Amino acid sequence: MALIFANGHSDVPSTQPPIGKQKKEIGRESVNYHPSVWGDRFAILTAHEIEVDEITKQRAEKLKHDVLKMLHNVSVSLQDLNLIDEIQRLGVGYHFETEIENAMKRIYNSRDNDDDDLHAVALRFRLLRQHGYNVSSDVFKKFKDEKGEFKASLRENVRGLLSFYEAAYLGTADDTILDQAIDFTTDQLKSVLPNLNPPLSELVKLALDVPLHKRIERLQSRYFISIYQEEKERNEVLLEFAKLDFNVLQSLHKEELSQLSRWWKDNDFARKLPFIRDRLVECYFWILGVYYEPRYSRGRMMTTKVISLTSIMDDTYDVYGKLDELELLTTAIERWEWAAMDELPDYMKLHFSALLTAVENFEEELSKEGKAYRISYFKNAYTKLAKAYLEEARWASADYVPTLEEYMKHAQVSSAYPVLTLSSLLGMGATATKEAFEWAINMPNAINAISVVCRLKDDITSAELEQQRVHVATAVECYIKENGTTYEETCKLFKQKVDSAWKEINKEWMDPLQVPREIIKRAVNFARVIEFLYRYKDMYTESAGETKECIAMVLVDRFVD
């Protein structure tokens, strides 16, 4: 039961049956996954549906230079802080990374903490922490009264409250004032929301749903462009550039998805493996959340293939495969040889063949750049994942319920996030050095914390289908059996553990790193995707509703004049 592909939603029983002495027969389960909500839509896209005209591209390039001029003139004023924030939230910050980083250095070195404007202080704090500067949260002490409570006057400052709310989610374990800020601002924003008007009300609703720090960047940009165009004090040049750039970038994303959809269709996975979830488009959207910028195009193509093949593997281990067959598949993956396919049942051969072909193609391309060593790291990580899946299948067969400690130690691998994080480095450029792969394979604190977020977010929204078939116990069930708690008590505790894991992620982001932030950001972005997809149910498996709407916003709908 891998984290990234859990199934459905239900309450977990408040008690766990005793560990069975007899092995259960696993495999050949019947799970009614809905078919792809996209069909062949992206596989048959025409050039007209994908391409953006040259006039649009030229206009976007001209506007880009206009925005660049604005950045050359930035100082440390609130107006300039707002400009940088708007550029990033509108999704065009990737064009100006050097200029923004230079501006953030100036802002940090200015040490200007004297402002009594809550919005200004919170915005400065958030931007600096987003860029890795470990500025002190003591700057917010000035907003408390003599009783140690946040001043009552702050309740009237909705923009300030919203900025403070967003900033508070970049806290670490040492930032107790930010924990207090989350409680205070959440209560106040919920209280005033019914009395607000757009666009401010839309910003508040968006933030209360998922805070900015935990949002998928591309989806956040799509929302923010629509909200920003209603702002009275909007920057028209910046707004037009953001819309055009969104359309230009969407064109590239459509082309990538079209190629991947044809690969998926040519392999005929959905028809030949009817027990799997047909979710190629959702997989691409997932990886678009990890990196959307043009320079990561190859990385998206490679990682989407990996995650979609991992989804097939997960359904094989979790739903369809019998234990003796899963033993054979695990051995075949350990060998990484075509000859190993002879030992597999016919239905496993398609997946195994596609996996070997994909990895061989990756290796051939990377060899031309002297980067073939990356594949050995991938094979190592993927083999560990297969072994972890097999161990969970054995647990399910034996009706074994581990302790939470044993479960979580195992889940660091079976969550699939270590292998997916490493996979996201395969197609990257020079930043993904051998040292970066060593960092990823050795499970650093950042990846451990992200695995906790992903594992527990999944298990809190544990699936109804999990309860309808033989399955490995979830973290919730493990804890309930071990401690005799209720479902509600356990979920509350796990949400606290998720919050603590995010604080560790934030700490790792700001502390001196073994690898560049460009590398660690891939791992952090995986956690952001999970925060979105597992807010209240498994929106990967059940992708016909909100998931489809969000994918359409990013990959179908263009901005028009």
From Swiss-Prot:
Coiled coil: none annotated. GO terms for biological process: diterpenoid biosynthetic process. Residues 6-26 are annotated as: Disordered. InterPro entries: Isoprenoid_synthase_dom_sf (IPR008949), Terpene_cyclase-like_1_C (IPR034741), Terpene_cyclase_plant_C1 (IPR044814), Terpene_synth_N (IPR001906), Terpene_synth_N_sf (IPR036965), Terpene_synthase-like (IPR050148), Terpene_synthase_metal-bd (IPR005630), Terpenoid_cyclase/PrenylTrfase (IPR008930). Mg(2+) 1 binds at residues 314, 318. A motif (DDXXD motif) lies at residues 314-318. Its cofactor is Mg(2+). Mg(2+) 2 binds at residues 314, 318. It catalyses: (2E,6E)-farnesyl diphosphate = beta-ylangene + diphosphate; (2E,6E)-farnesyl diphosphate = beta-copaene + diphosphate; (2E,6E)-farnesyl diphosphate = beta-cubebene + diphosphate. Mg(2+) 3 binds at residues 458, 462, 466. It is an enzyme of class 4 (lyase). One of its GO terms (molecular function) is terpene synthase activity. Pfam families: Terpene_synth, Terpene_synth_C. Its EC number is 4.2.3.127, 4.2.3.128, 4.2.3.-. Keywords: Cytoplasm, Lyase, Magnesium, Metal-binding. Pathway: Secondary metabolite biosynthesis; terpenoid biosynthesis. Its main location: cytoplasm. GO terms for cellular component: cytoplasm. Sesquiterpene synthase involved in the biosynthesis of volatile organic compounds. Mediates the conversion of (2E,6E)-farnesyl diphosphate (FPP) into beta-ylangene, beta-copaene and beta-cubebene. Does not use (2E)-geranyl diphosphate (GPP) as substrate. The Asp-Asp-Xaa-Xaa-Asp/Glu (DDXXD/E) motif is important for the catalytic activity, presumably through binding to Mg(2+). Monomer. Belongs to the terpene synthase family. Tpsa subfamily. This is Sesquiterpene synthase TPS2. It comes from Cananga odorata.
